[in-house]
Amino acid sequence: TLADTLMRRFPDPDAYPYRSWSYPQGFMLWGFIRLYEKTGKEEYRSYVMRYCEEHVAPDGSISGFTGCSLDDIMAGSVLVWAYRQTGEEKYKKACDAVRAAFSDYPRNSDGGFWHGRHLPGEMWVDGLFMGLMFLTRYGAFVGDREACFAETVRQLNIVFARCEKDNSGLLYHGFSENPETPWASRLDGRAQEIWCEGLGWYAMILVEVLALMPRETPGYDSVLMQLQKLLASLKKVQDPLSGLWFQVVDRTRTPGNWHDTSGSAMFLYTFRKASLCGFCGDEYDEVIRKGFEGIKTKCLLDLEGNLNVYDACDGLGIQVSYDHYIHYTKNVNAKEAVAAVLWASVAMEYEGIEG
């Protein structure tokens, strides 16, 4: 129902917010890719291919792509899928062009990618998903396998080392070595809080990476360790009544905190995929069941038969305080939340998981 709603609302997938060639479009389209892989329905494949054909010229150039940020790279992961689907040389060239953006991409002193070329020294947990959804798939299916996998592990390890809170597996929203960054602690450069959706991006990329990299890949165990620590802590901070997670994840008893649909759906996807892929045992089955029930309470049909998703923010950057996170405007059908619910619902309703 959600996929059908999206195709009615956005007959052209490039019209999905927030602009042409942007990470929410890539995120949403991966939901359609998974749905196509589970159902074989051509309408879902065609929807994704329409986007790819609209953006990639015969010479492989990509309209809208600049490589200005990790966000700008994310939709390139859909082009890796298009290349695998079609074998067309233009998609290979397009993937190579996205890969080339990493050649001069700015890094901090740890070797970690800045979130954007315009954000000196800043690493956001969100950026791991944005950059590595492409980079890991390029290595797995296009080329430069060893280097792509090594870089993927390196970036995950850097952010984990810089952003983990108190050996919990939970990560603060970001880290900056730039003393001018307003949200960064003067003591250690960290953001002040653990944002639900930000942690959700990190959670999802962990299972995506583990599903794509062979077990013998150097650094695989460190990524698996991060996932297993994260799952154990997420179980502890899941709201037992609603099955959902809070906007500021670990402040479960702090006044004003509320259940974030976007991050909660991302966590549900992560738990489900981790379970299906054998990255964890059955100890999280109840977390998954309660999480799915909770997500369903945030999705309501309107009189036209369209599914609407409630209680999430649109495009939230790193904030300076707890109050800023909890008072950020909530929107119906926030672009990240809708796509996250699509990912989670497909994972819950179909046993097979793309690897």
What are these regions (language model features)?
Residues 27-33, 70-83, 113-127, 169-194, ...:
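Carbohydrate-binding/catalytic loop surfaces
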Residues 201-252:
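Oxyanion-binding "anion nests"
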Residues 1-26, 38-45, 54-76, 82-98, ...:
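CBM-like carbohydrate-recognition segments
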